């Protein structure tokens, strides 16, 4: 949990405050962003990108399923690069539903989900179709998709809560398009991306070491218990 909090704090600080601690700041007038460098813009996601939803081919029509076209569900959106999918559809399924093929680099956001799913994002590593619970975000030339991806990672809790207002349980295109994003100049976006890639790789390495240590402890504990209950170890106190 501490590593997750560290990761979230690292991303949030980089995409809202930048890497230069000496620049003057101003109020962004956005709840999740707070203050931003004075020379940055703050724009709605809908202004910076084209946002679309997908669809689901008729489940009752077997000719629409088990084809060659990857089809993404919200459960597969989990802050990763999507390189494969659990299900695939056919050309007929694509033609006879609201989905379409989004290009690699497109950001997908999960709009539905009562658990932790709603508000999560991922980046397509392959051309893929997707269901109506996903929003496909194709960035304009003024922003880098990976920078926007990190912004949406940072805004996860804020975005998730947008789906809780009044009786609105899920997100929709209107809500997603109004999300505010801090926009530094392109060069700074590149610098922030490089910085985050390097720092997150370090955190990943630490997380892997911790996971390996926990696994080793569990193995040794299991081996000790087995040895104790089978009489291989004398647990009686020595006289």
Residue ranges and their predicted role:
Residues 27, 127-135, 165-190:
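A short glycine-rich beta-alpha junction/loop motif
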Residues 116-123:
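Short, Lys/Arg- and Gly-enriched loop/turn segments at beta-strand edges
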Residues 1-38, 209-239:
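Short amphipathic coiled-coil heptad-repeat segments
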Residues 28-55, 178-186, 190, 198-201, ...:
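Non-catalytic DNA-recognition/assembly elements of restriction-modification systems
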Residues 28-29, 46-60, 75-104, 130:
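Sequence-specific dsDNA recognition surfaces
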Residues 109-110:
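A generic structural signal for residues embedded in beta-strands
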Residues 9, 62-80:
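Short beta-strand/loop turn elements enriched in aromatics
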